[in-house]
């Protein structure tokens, strides 16, 4: 083949696309283009994946999506998280170590709720989520009511809320958190920050103010309060009784269970009746003419114990003082009838396994005025074993006397006492309100404190009393008697009426409010 012919062939091949070099060049160009396309697409996918990961791991989903809608308000997962955690913390603080009785181990914290079964089904996480939703519905209904009624937070109330949240900076630093946001997120859930917590706190304060405003509209006459208290039929009265329980012999049945039968229960009743007869005999004697007369001044508890001993029965009577009528058990109906000191009877136990010999000592129907007092608590310092030594108590007394002297040498008024209480008192329950307890009931405080409250003092009377609570504290109270409050019976009845009316009012407010859970509710908890 001539050179010219070969040249023409190559030219024709190029024109038709069949030249091998051209084909190779075109294939290389195509591969490069394909490679560039793959690289570009891969890069886009990687970038999108990175963005998705960052998005999911950020707070955006928790702050910008909707987890719950109530009426015209939407709540983000972060906002629900705060209420969810708050429900758990409030519950844990209320029940403390008793939470274990309900099957909850609070030591595992929020993270452990999803792995603990709730007794009625589901998990404890489910329980607290529903509690949070219920609370949010109520708060939403109340704050809507507040807006409709023109109830707003005052500048002072707003400042108080801001002051409380301002303290979070120091708390966060003290506990080693980089910021308040980190503190809140770690303890309340992802996305929870200062804004979320502040708004929830503000909302709660407004709701409380609205509830208080409603309660202030409730008024009850003395007749209404007395009628309400009498409707309890002695359930809220306090009783002082002494009893001895005669247990019937338990007989084993064919299935291995043990229980009293008619014969053994009858035998127990005979013993109880013998003790009762001996008790009654100890209460009478004969006068000079041979007539039976009651023995005056007998101690009821000692009398019952003497009767038990006379009958050759082992054991002693048990005294239950300051017990409400509703807690008396099998003999409550007998005790709540008209009784005099020393009355006694035999009552079968409701379980059919024995009977009581019970004697009546006294009954308090709560028709006494509540005490209003101020105090300054100076606590003794416990040693390493938790013991309050005489030296520690003496030091506390000396400090209490110093504070008392400071008050006496000053203006010596109720106002100056209140100021010293806020300055010196170690009672966290009253040292922010001048040491005031304005509705003290009998038996509510430690013994010496209680005795001061109900010793017939006049307004302005003062003194120092010792106080000690098992497992709590030991120390001295500088006391200031303010005066008498309302009757305890009226206080009990009024609180009951207010609680009932408030619940009915709240039920009417939340009627029509529903919570709609969104897709992102799954992020809660």
Feature names for model-found ranges:
Residues 1-15:
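N-terminal targeting leaders characterized by basic, low-complexity, disordered sequences
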Residues 274-332, 367, 402-448, 482-483, ...:
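Peptidyl-prolyl cis-trans isomerase
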């Amino acid at each position: 083949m001539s050179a010219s012919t070969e040249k023409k062939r190559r030219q024709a091949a190029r024109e038709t696309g069949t030249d091998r070099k051209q084909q190779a060049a075109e294939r290389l160009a195509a591969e490069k283009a394909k490679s560039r396309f793959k690289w570009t697409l891969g890069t886009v996918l990687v970038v999108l994946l990175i963005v998705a990961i960052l998005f999911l791991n950020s707070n955006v989903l928790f702050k910008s999506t909707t987890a719950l809608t109530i009426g015209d308000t939407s709540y983000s997962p972060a906002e629900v998280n705060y209420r969810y955690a708050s429900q758990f913390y409030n519950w844990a603080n209320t029940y403390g170590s008793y939470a274990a009785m309900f099957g909850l181990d609070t030591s595992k914290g929020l993270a452990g709720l999803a792995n603990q079964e709730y007794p009625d089904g589901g998990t404890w996480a489910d329980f607290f989520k529903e509690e949070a939703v219920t609370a949010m519905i109520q708060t939403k209904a109340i704050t809507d009511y507040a807006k409709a009624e023109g109830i707003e937070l005052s500048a002072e109330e707003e400042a108080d809320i801001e002051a409380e949240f301002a303290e979070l900076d120091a708390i966060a630093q003290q506990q080693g958190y980089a910021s308040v946001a980190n503190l809140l997120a770690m303890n309340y859930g992802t996305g929870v920050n200062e804004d979320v917590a502040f708004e929830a706190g503000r909302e709660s304060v407004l709701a409380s103010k609205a509830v208080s405003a409603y309660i202030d509209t409730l008024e009850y006459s003395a007749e209404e309060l007395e009628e309400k208290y009498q409707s309890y039929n002695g359930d809220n009265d306090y009783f002082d009784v002494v009893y001895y329980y005669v247990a019937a012999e338990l007989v084993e049945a064919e299935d291995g269970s043990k229980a009293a039968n008619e014969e053994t229960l009858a035998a127990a009743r005979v013993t109880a009746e013998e003790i009762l007869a001996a008790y009654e005999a100890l209460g009478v004697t004969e006068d000079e003419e041979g007539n039976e007369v009651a023995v005056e001044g007998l101690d009821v508890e000692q009398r019952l114990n003497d009767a038990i001993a006379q009958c050759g029965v082992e054991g002693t009577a048990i005294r239950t003082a300051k017990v409400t009528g509703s807690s008396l058990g099998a003999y409550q109906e007998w005790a709540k009838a008209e009784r005099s000191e020393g009355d006694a009877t035999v009552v079968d136990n409701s379980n059919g396994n024995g009977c009581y010999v019970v004697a009546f000592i006294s009954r308090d129907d709560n028709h006494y005025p509540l005490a209003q007092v101020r105090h300054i608590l100076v606590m003794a310092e416990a040693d390493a074993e938790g013991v309050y030594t005489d030296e520690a108590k003496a030091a506390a007394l000396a400090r209490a006397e110093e504070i008392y002297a400071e008050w006496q040498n000053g203006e010596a008024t109720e106002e100056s006492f209140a100021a010293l209480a806020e300055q010196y008192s170690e009672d966290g329950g009253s040292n922010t309100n001048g040491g005031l307890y304005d509705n003290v009931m009998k038996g509510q405080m430690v013994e010496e404190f209680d005795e001061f409250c109900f010793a017939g003092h006049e307004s302005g009377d003062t003194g120092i009393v010792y106080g000690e609570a098992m497992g709590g504290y030991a120390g001295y109270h500088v006391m200031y008697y303010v005066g008498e409050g309302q009757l305890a019976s009226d206080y009990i009845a009024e609180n009951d009426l207010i609680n009932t009316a408030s619940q009915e009012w709240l039920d009417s407010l939340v009627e029509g409010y529903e919570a709609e859970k969104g897709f992102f509710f799954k992020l809660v908890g």
